[in-house]
From Swiss-Prot:
It comes from Encephalitozoon cuniculi (strain GB-M1) (Microsporidian parasite). Belongs to the WD repeat G protein beta family. It comes from the Eukaryota. Keywords: Repeat, WD repeat. The keyword Repeat applies. PROSITE patterns: WD_REPEATS_1 (PS00678), WD_REPEATS_2 (PS50082), WD_REPEATS_REGION (PS50294). The keyword Repeat applies. This is Guanine nucleotide-binding protein subunit beta-like protein. WD repeats lie at residues 14-55, 65-104, 106-145, 152-192, 215-256, 257-294. PANTHER family: F-BOX AND WD REPEAT DOMAIN CONTAINING 7, WD40 REPEAT PROTEIN. It holds the Pfam family WD40.
Length: 334
């Protein structure tokens, strides 16, 4: 795809405040989008509904679970379980059909992010309290990764994401500027990156020097693995984006969006990465290592930010600071 354009499709209207989380699952031939918001609500949407009305695509409303804003969500592969986390310091495991929920406790402050592993058996949450909690699907706290743990982050845990095929491998991104990769089964730290560069603790130890592994100006804001898990893409508040090849521990591509990166999604049908920023939605093609399309959010209004992203084929769903969910169709240009 040498060049492309983003065409705005019909908005999904329902939320009244920032849409902080989006997740698409495919169940029984249906494609369901889950969205979470600062308005303390979660909606599920039938993306292929034929009903033509403002709220026609909404299947269910999940509310009453959080007393403060919802900061993120994830949904199991079979669509039966949803996990939400919020600024009230808790998480909840929801049965998506009955809407009943189980409380996740253990954090001392706002919970910012959540991820469910590849076989739907592990849940990890990250918090302002600088800890990550591992739960089972019954809601039991299995492991608390805090300041007493070697190699732990020294800032807020802004984002977490499980490897798409390795059930115990987790990546985490922090306000301390680092991305870390962990094996939760062995509780082992595997890798650390700062500014796209691998932090070699062993080499620093040999040279008797202190490794550089803290820089708040590089606060990590979003991340996503490639479909096969070989590449981890992450973005910073600085505007920088990095593609890191996990096996060789090298940064293979980078890009500067200038303004903070708020969200990242990996393309399903094309070799692209989508970035949501404080000004635009950007499509980065990994084959040519360049931007092939962008959408200026000022066309919607001043100060509009893209806080969450999810691909459905060639359609990119964008959760905005206004509360709207805007689908953008990625089309090849003539």
């Amino acid at each position: 795809m040498s060049s492309a354009e983003l065409e705005v499709l019909e908005y999904l209207n329902g939320h009244k405040d920032e849409v902080k989380g989006l997740k698409i699952v495919r169940v029984s031939g249906r494609e369901i989008l889950y969205s979470s918001s600062r308005d303390k609500k979660v909606f599920s949407w039938d993306l292929h509904s034929k009903i033509d009305s403002e709220f026609g695509k909404i299947l269910k409303l999940y509310d009453g679970g959080h007393s403060k804003r919802i900061n993120g969500l994830d949904v199991s592969k079979d669509g039966n379980m949803m996990v939400t986390v919020g600024s009230d310091g808790i998480g909840r495991i929801w049965d998506t059909e009955s809407k009943k929920s189980i409380l996740l406790e253990g954090h001392g402050r706002d919970v910012l992010c959540v991820s469910i592993n590849s076989n739907d058996t592990k849940i990890v949450t990250g918090s302002v309290d600088r800890t990550m909690n591992l739960y089972n699907t019954k809601g039991d706290l299995v492991l608390k990764m805090g300041r007493d743990m070697e190699m732990m982050h020294r800032g807020w845990i802004n984002c977490v994401t499980f490897h798409p095929t390795e059930e115990s491998i987790l990546a985490s991104g922090s306000a301390d500027g680092t991305v870390k990769i962990w094996d939760l089964d062995t509780q082992e730290h595997l890798q650390t990156y700062l500014g796209g560069a691998y932090v070699d603790y062993e080499k620093a130890k040999e040279k008797k020097t202190s490794p550089v592994d803290y820089d708040e100006s590089k606060s990590v804001t979003a991340m996503a693995f490639s479909k096969d898990g070989s590449i981890l893409t992450y973005g910073e508040k600085s505007g920088k984006m990095y593609l890191v090849k996990v096996d060789s521990k090298e940064c293979i591509q980078s890009f500067d969006a200038i303004v903070p990166v708020r969200s990242i999604a990996v393309g399903e049908t094309e070799p692209v990465i989508a970035l949501g920023t404080d000004e635009s939605v950007i499509i980065w093609e990994t084959i040519s290592s360049r931007v092939i399309a962008s959408y200026n959010l000022k066309e919607i209004g001043n100060g509009v930010r893209c806080l969450s992203l999810a691909f459905s084929g060639s359609t990119l769903y964008c959760g905005l600071s206004t509360g709207a969910i805007v689908p953008l169709e990625l089309r090849k240009s003539d």
